[in-house]
Amino acid sequence: MNLPLQQHGELPRAARSAARGGSDRSGHAPGVLRIAFGIVSLFAGGGLQRNCLAIARILRRRGHEVVIFTSRLADPLPSDVAIEVLPNRAWTNHRRNLRFAADLAEATESRFDLVVGFDKLSGLDVLYCADASIAARSGWRRLTPRYRALRALEAACFAAGADTRVIALSPSQIEGYRRAWGTEPQRVALLPPNIERERRHPQHRLDGTRERRRAALGLKAEDWCWLAIGRQPRTKGFDRAIAALPAFPTARLFVVGLAASEPAAGPVFKLARSLQVEDRVKFLGYADEEIPALMAAADLLIHPARNETTGTVILEAVVNGLPVVTTAVCGYAAHVRDADAGVVVPEPFAQARLLAALGEARDHRRASEWSANGMRYGERPELYSG
């Protein structure tokens, strides 16, 4: 992974000094940066959280010292990266973010050369930005305390004249922030697509893995297996996928990243029951390491998200030969078009358009073409360079 803001000319002053071998604010070895990462919630299974941990490990391998600060540690995580929890008693998410920003500033003062945020926070040297601009939203939500709090944190990073350098993940994301804030182009760097090579296993569709995993899932030969991945049901459009099930009697939906026992799964099950398709929906919980094999077992990645800056699972599906049906709001939907590996449902979203896309994906010959196209697309080295 190439970190685009590591050039000395773009680092904050103390970090440039340390990187050149001069003195720095924490007094450690010349050439070594002491870097603080800030992320509000740290848990297994989240894409942002996985990227945070991966980047921390890369920087550690390069000899730098990294400490991850978080307000909430939801799962046991590997001990190879230092993690400090800053207790936070806020009752709402937006107040939690505000409190965490203040706590992070206090905890890192004079201790670190570089403070990197994985959420929009005040006082950051660098922001790894994984979501869209809240300032661009319209309607009644702009009147809420939540909106005002999150907008203030966004302004601290993106308003014209701010000092924070930004790592962005898609061109459309950058454009959205520039329209909202007039963010200076020289403060923003675009991170190329990046998927881990070890998550690409197109051979699993041909070497018997597909058949073994389908049998383990209880799938019959005639079952049309849809795979959905994520922890935020509404954001990822799980309800849209379930609403499509009645139109396709042989379809079965498997959800990775969310367990049936979690509160967030409740509304999804309620919708499935109301449509009498609950027997065709199964939650597999957190199964990140199994995703390549599950992609081999599946016939389709269904990802009708409402909001998705990138959508790494989209690109992972493409390179693993799994046809994709997704929405145009997803940053990585462009790879589905470029590879000719599925269907991108245009905006504004309509359920009828999703049903039409699924009808196209049901054609076995077309789906086979998409699968082969995705496997070829996955041979491009630039997909693994971010």
Language-model segments: residues:
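Short hydrophobic beta-strand element within catalytic cores of glycosyltransferases
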Residues: 323-327
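Glycosyltransferase donor-sugar binding loop
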Residues: 73, 195, 229, 252-269, ...
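Short alpha-helical donor nucleotide-sugar binding micro-motif in glycosyltransferases
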Residues: 286-287, 293-298
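Aromatic "clamp/platform" in nucleotide-sugar-dependent glycosyltransferases that forms part
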Residues: 306
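A charged, aromatic-enriched C-terminal amphipathic alpha-helix characteristic of glycosyltransferases
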Residues: 47, 365-386
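A conserved mid-protein helix/loop that constitutes part of the nucleotide-sugar donor-binding site
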Residues: 50-54, 224-247, 263-266
